[in-house]
């Protein structure tokens, strides 16, 4: 999933260059991701890519809210919330949602990026691990769905919206208003589910010109 990762600094979109130091069973354990534009570097340690910005890397990550469901039940809910019916697509699960990353990946046959996960969440062939502070380091329009909880910063919603592809869904906490660009499909006392509109395709009769 390295191909989806991007620099969090504001400049033109470009791939990151990977320098790998340790690999085990095809998993990257240690290395560096470098930006060819601004020359920022992001460390990969123990399989976790660290995109926390200057001054944030030393801060303790916020505590996750306790899970109200088992991981399998949470995976079923996530699959429904994010309409994860496309095998091979990529989902992003942040905070407490990330605790069920492996179960979601298996149940929906998707790739999952777990953002700021707890210690129990491990990397696998279909689950990647990220540490972030304010921005999701993802290519524009690259993911099918994003779910974040109360532990994320409000700024992260903007980068989540940017990473969401047309027709994709975003699950967010009630403490943060859903983006105006999205259509809210459902909400309860803790979360809302919203969807990005599909791109409109203009149709014209063959042989006609404007």
PLM region spans:
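Short beta->alpha connector loops
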Residues: 95-99, 150-154, 176
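A short glycine-rich, Lys/Arg-flanked "PGG" loop and its adjoining helix->strand segment in the class I
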Residues: 154-170, 174-176
């Amino acid at each position: 999933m390295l191909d989806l990762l991007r620099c969090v600094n504001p400049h033109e979109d470009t791939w990151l260059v990977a320098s790998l130091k340790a690999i085990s069973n095809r998993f990257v354990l240690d290395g560096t991701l470098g930006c060819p534009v601004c020359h920022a570097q992001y460390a990969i340690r123990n399989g976790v890519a660290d995109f926390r910005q200057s001054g944030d890397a030393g801060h303790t990550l916020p505590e996750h809210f306790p899970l109200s469901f088992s991981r399998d039940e949470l995976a079923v809910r996530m699959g429904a919330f994010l309409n994860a019916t496309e095998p091979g697509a990529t989902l992003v699960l942040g905070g407490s949602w990330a605790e069920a990353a492996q179960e979601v990946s298996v149940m929906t046959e998707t790739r999952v990026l777990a953002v700021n996960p707890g210690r129990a969440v491990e990397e696998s062939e279909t689950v990647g691990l990220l540490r972030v502070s304010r921005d999701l380091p993802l290519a524009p329009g690259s993911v099918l769905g994003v779910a974040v909880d109360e532990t994320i910063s409000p700024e992260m919603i903007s980068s989540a919206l940017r990473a969401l592809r047309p027709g994709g869904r975003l699950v967010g906490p009630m403490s943060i208003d859903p983006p105006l660009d999205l259509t809210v499909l459902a909400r309860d006392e803790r979360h809302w589910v919203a969807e990005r509109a599909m791109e409109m395709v203009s149709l014209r009769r063959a042989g006609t010109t404007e």
